[in-house]
Design a protein with these regions (language model features):
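Positively charged n-region of N-terminal signal peptides that target proteins for export
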Residues: 1-8
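Sec/Tat signal peptide C-region and signal peptidase I cleavage site
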Residues: 14-19
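A short beta-strand-turn-helix
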Residues: 31-51
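Short, glycine-anchored, charge-dense loop/turn motifs used at functional sites
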Residues: 38, 60, 139-155
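Short active-site neighborhood of thiol/selenol oxidoreductases, capturing the structured segment around
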Residues: 44-64
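Loop/turn elements at helix/coil->beta-strand transitions in domains of secreted/extracellular proteins
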Residues: 48-51, 81-87, 114-117, 144-145
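Structural microenvironment flanking redox-active thiols in thiol-disulfide oxidoreductases
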Residues: 64-112, 123-128
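Short, internal strand/loop/helix patches
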Residues: 106-143, 148-149
Length: 155
């Protein structure tokens, strides 16, 4: 009986830890996440603007493809020139693949030639979980009304 109760409790608890999957046309989840310098950035900061959220992992071969070809930097430049807010998000936990410490962020992105609005450090993964970001580069485009109009891969 004790085993059955434990099994039931675990079964009921699993959905509580599942990631949310954001659907197109749904409101974008609010966030407030700090960059490497400690400055907080939020979705509310970009209210009334287009926003791109780009999940980044320096060791991901698909991220490498887009950064080594300068594709991602070109998109950042093009759309930011049109007033888009571009947040690059690092959700890698300390010591895990793709992790960048605060002191490593600026040199890494200078080397990449990338100039997003800000690089957000989501080491606890809360923002990634709120958006359901599972891979890199995982992209979300949010319209000025705060709705997700694209969610998925860049290719």
């Amino acid at each position: 009986m004790k085993t059955l109760v434990t099994l039931l409790a675990l079964t009921l608890a699993i959905p509580a830890f599942a990631q949310t999957e954001i659907k197109v046309d749904s409101p974008a989840p609010a966030f407030s996440v700090k960059d490497a310098s400690g400055k907080a950035h939020s979705l509310a900061d970009a209210k009334g603007k287009w926003v791109v959220l780009e999940w980044y992992n320096k060791d991901c071969p698909y991220v490498r493809k887009h950064y080594d070809s300068k594709n991602m930097q070109g998109l950042q430049t093009k759309y930011m020139a049109q007033g888009v807010t571009w947040y690059t998000v690092i959700s890698s936990a300390t010591g895990k693949q793709g992790f960048l410490g605060n002191a490593d962020v600026a040199p890494n992105f200078t080397k990449e030639g990338a100039k997003p609005t800000a690089v957000l450090i989501d080491t606890d993964g809360a923002m990634g979980k709120a958006y359901g970001a599972k891979t890199t580069p995982h992209m979300y485009v949010i319209n000025p009304e705060g709705k997700v109009v694209y969610a998925g891969a860049i290719d």
